Amino acid sequence: RYARVALEAGKHVIVEKPLAPSAAQTEELVELARRKKVFLFEAVTTQYLENYAKIRELLPRIGTVKLVQCNFSQYSSRYDAFCAGDVQPAFDLACAGGALMDLNVYNISYIVGLFGEPNRVNYAANIDHGIDTSGILTMDYSGFKAVSMAAKDCGAPARYVIQGTKGYLLQKSTANFC
């Protein structure tokens, strides 16, 4: 809502992730920015971090990629309130809340930035009070699979593993701290 107002006023806009709750809304914002001749950016910067460039550089050393695993799971400080009926933006569908849009977007950006758009995508979520509190997104690429996990209802150490025929790359931090 605020992004649209700023674009209509002819302002350049940086939007926190996700850019919009749906592809259709994203296209509307992009078209508006083009018409107004202003810039519209999403604030996910993972692909521009120095260590991300290093991962890209090291990928050929592990041979043919076969499996990719990304896990960004952190017990939300707002989860208990959510369970008690206090729905804050992080758990509000109208605000693009939930595990997919709040956390898994970093995993997806990481994977798609390295390997491009997948052939198929499937999302299996744990739904609580109508919103995904955790879930697993699988991406099917020609020759390999990627699994992207995110949770707001439980925690685990961040772990990113890219497995190839000659080795693997392991990152022990979230994608946005690449």
Predicted feature descriptions by range:
Residues 1-47:
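Beta-strand-loop-alpha-helix segment that lines the small-molecule cofactor/substrate pocket
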Residues 3-8, 27-30, 54-58, 81-86, ...:
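Short, glycine/charged-enriched secondary-structure capping and boundary segments
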Residues 16, 71, 163:
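Alpha/beta-hydrolase-fold catalytic nucleophile elbow
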Residues 18, 44-47, 72, 127, ...:
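Structured beta->alpha junctions
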Residues 22, 75-80, 156-158, 170-172:
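A short beta-to-alpha transition loop/helix N-cap that caps and shapes the active-site region
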Residues 46-119:
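Predominantly a Rossmann-like dinucleotide-binding segment in NAD(P)-dependent oxidoreductases
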Residues 107-177:
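Contiguous beta-strand/loop segments that form the cofactor/metal-binding neighborhood of enzyme cores
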